[in-house]
A protein has these predicted regions:
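N-terminal, active-site-proximal structural segment of metallo-dependent hydrolase catalytic domains
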Residues: 2-6, 18-81, 93-97, 153, ...
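Sec-dependent signal peptide hydrophobic core
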Residues: 5-13
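Active-site-proximal beta-strand elements of phosphoester/diester hydrolases
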Residues: 22-34, 113, 128-142
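Active-site beta-strand/loop signature of hydrolases that rely on acidic residues for catalysis
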Residues: 23-30, 45-69, 136-139, 154-182, ...
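Structured beta-strand-rich core segments of catalytic domains in phosphoester-bond hydrolases
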Residues: 37-38, 62-134, 224-231
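Metal-dependent phosphoester-hydrolase catalytic domains
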Residues: 114-115, 145-149, 157-167, 173-249
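N-terminal post-signal-peptidase region of extra-cytosolic proteins
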Residues: 37-45, 87-89, 195-201
């Protein structure tokens, strides 16, 4: 499976137009690198990420120096194992450290900011990172539909003056036909195939993980390749991959 995935991605990258801006995006709720077998395994998660050769990755459910993960900064481990640059945002204090989300990227961000998101059962957050050719947002949304709806105008407000292509990815905790997703669709184009389910990893029966392109500032997105990676063990979610070509204004 890994060889076939690598060859498919390589084919897309080789035959894309040379002048086109193309971005290989992954969204992955890594469940703090605890697999369906209850085993902590950072290398296993890193291997899943690396086999897709991503330009950028949105990660959810990361411990940072907590008692639970024996003082390890999970994103730092994944940085070392993948060779990508990490950007971390704590959502809540947890067991002497924190718990949050992150980005892994080939480029170091020019700058980034962290914006609190609604979350009545647990505080949530959004990372907005600017790169040379695009802006990337990573998030893990609330379990509560009311919070998810409240988050949409906050996201839109944060992005309304950005004049680069914008992507957003994460575990949105909502179904494709839900009210929060319909509200997001007023501002974002969904790039992944929502009929390919992402959760739970061993027997997926729903799509709650998404990759989007922002549709309000004149850029268009041509999906070259998209896939839910068929990994049943590394996390409780399956990772979502999209290779997209950006078309200018």
């Amino acid at each position: 499976m890994k060889r076939n995935l690598f060859l498919s991605v390589l084919f897309v990258l080789m035959f894309a137009p040379a002048h086109a801006q193309q971005v290989n995006i992954l969204s992955y709720n890594v469940h703090n690198c605890i697999g369906m077998d209850k085993e902590y395994n950072y290398r296993r998660i890193a291997n899943v990420i690396s086999q897709t050769s991503p330009d950028i990755v949105a990660l959810q459910e990361l411990d940072s120096v907590t008692v639970r993960n024996k003082g390890i900064h999970a994103l730092g481990e994944l940085e070392k194992l993948t060779g990508l640059h990490g950007t971390y945002a704590a959502a809540i204090p947890f067991q002497g450290g924190s718990y949050g989300i992150g980005i892994l990227s080939r480029e170091i961000p020019i700058k980034y900011k962290i914006i609190p998101m609604p979350g009545r059962e647990e505080k949530r957050t959004l990372i907005i990172a600017e790169f040379k050719d695009y802006v990337f947002c990573a998030t893990h949304q609330s379990l509560t539909p009311e919070d998810q709806l409240l988050a949409v105008p906050l996201i839109e407000k944060a992005l309304q003056n950005v004049d680069k292509p914008i992507f957003m990815a994460g575990d949105m905790n909502s179904a494709p036909a839900s009210a929060p997703q319909l509200e997001l669709a007023k501002h974002f184009a969904t790039l992944n195939d929502t009929t390919s389910y992402t959760f739970p990893a061993d027997r997926p029966n729903r799509c709650i993980d998404y990759i989007y392109g922002y549709s309000k500032n004149g850029y268009r997105f041509d999906v070259q390749y998209r896939k839910v990676i068929e990994d049943t063990i590394s996390s409780d979610h399956r990772p979502v991959q999209v290779i997209v070509q950006v078309k200018g204004k």
